Amino acid sequence: STNAKSEQSAEDIIKNRKALFSKNYNTAKKVQSLSSNGDFDEAKRLMLEMSENYITLKEMFPENTKEGFKTEVTPLIWEEKEKFNSLMEKSSNDMVQLISTIEDEDDIRGTLGKLMWSNCKACHSKYRLPH
């Protein structure tokens, strides 16, 4: 809810969104490993989790979180809010697509590259400070 978000401090929001992006990255590595080993049920469960996290992340960039508290995002997120949100939605939708197609893919690595890792890269190259 909007009220709960406004009551949350900028510091908490920044820490939480960093933790969620970090979690998605670690989950993506697990998805890669599980899918490569044919453990699709667990991989799909994690894909769904990632998909939901991307939707949550859209709400984690209020105006008061542009700087401070070791945030690693560029101000461009707020200037291009619709583009950023679209990228989060695409990332979420691509994970859902993966759930329904991953078992039938011949090239699992390539498919994960296209539908999972490319979204990480697209966002990082544009909206994350170089580090």
Model region roles, listed by residue range:
Residues 8-131:
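Sequence context surrounding c-type heme c attachment/ligation sites in exported
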Residues 2-8:
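Sec/Tat signal peptide C-region and signal peptidase I cleavage site
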